[in-house]
Amino acid sequence: MADFTLILAEGVVEPTAFGLDATVWVSIAMLVFLGILVWKGVPGAIAAMLDKRIAEISKQLGEAEQLRLDAESLKAEYEAKLADAAKEADEMRARADAEAQALVAKAKADATALIARRKQMAEDRIAAAEANALAEVRAAAVKAATEAAAKLIADRHDVAADKALVDQAIASIAKG
């Protein structure tokens, strides 16, 4: 079989023009095509398009960097605000605790004062009740003594003794 391939290869003739085979003509055509492209300024246009694209990408990168810086600035600002809010909340909590303690102390003092006032009022009522009871007992004793004295005087005095007492009272008024 190798002999058959060799026989076929001997009979094939490569076409040539002006003594140049197809590979050389393709290379020449390619060089001419590339020359025309260079002559028309295609590489400059491609370079301009690439430069424009590079500029756009650089601009986008710059904007992205600025956005990143803005975001970091906002983040720092909000972290500071958050820290301030936490500090203010702690201060408010401390003030509320102090106010609550002051209110508790005031309530205790008010309760103690109220208890003392009520105790004093109760003691005053008891003293008044004792004084009233003592006055009633004295009045009853005076009334009983008066009634007993009146009864004794009525039993022991007669009209003559009454006349002598009246005369004596008139005489003491007249002297006076």
Swiss-Prot record:
It is a single-pass membrane protein. It is found in: Cell inner membrane. Disulfide bonds: none annotated. The chain crosses the membrane at residues 18-38. Pfam families: ATP-synt_B. It comes from the Bacteria. GO terms for molecular function: proton-transporting ATP synthase activity, rotational mechanism; proton-transporting ATPase activity, rotational mechanism. GO terms for cellular component: plasma membrane; proton-transporting ATP synthase complex. InterPro entries: ATP_synth_b/b'su_bac/chlpt, ATP_synthase_B_chain. Keywords: ATP synthesis, Cell inner membrane, Cell membrane, CF(0), Hydrogen ion transport, Ion transport, Membrane, Transmembrane, Transmembrane helix, Transport. F(1)F(0) ATP synthase produces ATP from ADP in the presence of a proton or sodium gradient. F-type ATPases consist of two structural domains, F(1) containing the extramembraneous catalytic core and F(0) containing the membrane proton channel, linked together by a central stalk and a peripheral stalk. During catalysis, ATP synthesis in the catalytic domain of F(1) is coupled via a rotary mechanism of the central stalk subunits to proton translocation. Belongs to the ATPase B chain family. F-type ATPases have 2 components, F(1) - the catalytic core - and F(0) - the membrane proton channel. F(1) has five subunits: alpha(3), beta(3), gamma(1), delta(1), epsilon(1). F(0) has three main subunits: a(1), b(2) and c(10-14). The alpha and beta chains form an alternating ring which encloses part of the gamma chain. F(1) is attached to F(0) by a central stalk formed by the gamma and epsilon chains, while a peripheral stalk is formed by the delta and b chains. HAMAP family: ATP_synth_b_bprime (MF_01398). This is ATP synthase subunit b. The lineage of its organism: Bacteria, Pseudomonadati, Pseudomonadota, Alphaproteobacteria, Sphingomonadales. The gene is atpF.
